[in-house]
Swiss-Prot record:
PPIases accelerate the folding of proteins. It catalyzes the cis-trans isomerization of proline imidic peptide bonds in oligopeptides. Acts as a regulatory subunit for PP2A-like phosphatases modulating their activity or substrate specificity, probably by inducing a conformational change in the catalytic subunit, a direct target of the PPIase. Can reactivate inactive phosphatase PP2A-phosphatase methylesterase complexes (PP2Ai) in presence of ATP and Mg(2+) by dissociating the inactive form from the complex. It holds the Pfam family PTPA. Belongs to the PTPA-type PPIase family. InterPro entries: Phstyr_phstse_ac, PTPA_C_lid, PTPA_sf. This is Serine/threonine-protein phosphatase 2A activator 2. GO terms for cellular component: cytoplasm; nucleus; protein phosphatase type 2A complex. It comes from the Eukaryota. The gene is rrd2. It catalyses: [protein]-peptidylproline (omega=180) = [protein]-peptidylproline (omega=0). It comes from Schizosaccharomyces pombe (strain 972 / ATCC 24843) (Fission yeast).
Length: 352
């Protein structure tokens, strides 16, 4: 466990990436190395481990799973409201978000950490479920969740022995929870590149999912085009499970048309190459993109680089000094997700 003195140096994280110069400093700094190393270490830890693998679960893993269970209960306590058939975000998400925010300090008591440390960890936690104002979710929020786990690791809650379970137990449960929230509240995609992106909402199921399959005897990237294999293997492998979900979400068109990037990747010969490519893509398209990283938060344990802009002083620090994306859904021009389209068309969403 991190010393009490060090924990008391923690503070509520704030934005510090306001322009391209700040992004450059981030990519050259300690925070980037911390995040990148953590993602790569988790990736290595989950290689050749299906979701059904027998993996030890520490009490810390159990605590996190229980916290996610509570978030699921909060969702049920804040039902979606009649949104007059709108395909955009349901306002009830804001009540859900507010309750998660209120309960965050209590949920962190189980870790026995100092107040300041809980405040630093807590902001990454509640921000990982989407944006309250825009009622959207994207890879930046997914990054907040990984940052929450990283903060807990920095505090000494997790060790490297926990890494396999952090992916195939905790992260898998988080993705399932987020999928339920996306459906329940019709969350909009944040920063979606549309059909030409990897996915409207998530990136890491593909990265970690490829790692799971690196040395598989029989399964190859081309098998994502085989519906029978997807059906048989979706419960054990994140990558295949996510493609299965996308196919069910968009049943009227082929993978080639609804997810051309995933279809292109299926031509790669080995999962090892896919995994290497996913890591490079994550660095370039998430950690290296200003429209995503301008919303990222820095505290004591994930520190801003020297020379970065000071935190915005007025208003909501997640909204002011916003740098515009070139995509249509930047700055409030709403784009409904495939999930909302499927609900609107009466398609059955494959989630219970």
């Amino acid at each position: 466990m991190l010393s009490r003195e060090e924990q008391n140096r923690c503070f509520v994280p704030v934005r510090r990436i306001l322009d391209n110069e700040d992004l450059k400093l981030f990519k050259e700094g300690d925070a980037y190395k911390l995040i990148d190393s953590f993602i790569c270490d988790l990736d290595e830890a989950v290689k050749d481990k299906p979701i059904s693998a027998s993996i030890p679960q520490s009490s810390s893993i159990e605590h996190v799973l229980n916290i996610l269970d509570r978030v699921g209960e909060i969702k049920q306590e804040n039902p979606a409201i009649d949104n007059m058939g709108s395909r955009f975000g349901n306002p009830a998400f804001q009540s859900f978000y507010d309750q998660v925010y209120i309960e965050t300090p209590k949920l962190h008591q189980v870790f026995g950490i100092e107040h300041n440390a809980a405040m630093e960890a807590g902001r990454y936690f509640y921000e990982s479920f989407g944006n309250r104002k825009r009622i959207d979710y994207g890879s930046g929020h997914e990054l907040y969740f990984m940052s929450w786990l990283l903060i807990l690791k920095q505090l000494g809650i997790f060790t490297k022995n926990d890494y396999p379970a952090l992916v195939v137990r905790v992260f898998v449960k988080y993705v399932e929870l987020m999928r339920s929230l996306q459906i329940f509240y019709t969350l909009e995609p944040a920063g979606s590149h549309g059909v030409w992106g990897l996915d409207d909402f998530h990136f890491l199921p593909f990265l970690f999912g490829a790692a799971q399959l690196v040395n598989h005897k029989y399964l190859r990237p081309k098998h994502v085009r085989d519906p029978e294999i997807l059906e048989m293997c979706r419960a054990d492998y994140m990558y295949l499970g996510y493609v299965y979900f996308l196919n069910k979400l968009k049943p009227s068109v082929s993978l080639r048309f609804h997810s051309p990037m995933i279809d292109d990747i299926s031509a790669v010969k080995t999962w090892s190459k896919v995994n290497e490519g996913m890591i490079k893509m994550y660095r370039a398209e998430v950690l290296g993109k200003l429209p995503i990283m301008q919303h990222y938060l820095f505290g004591h344990l994930i520190p801003a680089s020297p020379g970065m802009s000071p935190a915005p002083q007025d208003g909501d620090d997640s909204e002011v000094t916003h740098v515009h994306s070139h995509y249509a859904d930047c700055c409030g021009i709403k784009i409904p997700s495939a999930i909302s389209a499927a609900k609107n068309n009466g398609s059955r969403i494959p989630f219970d």
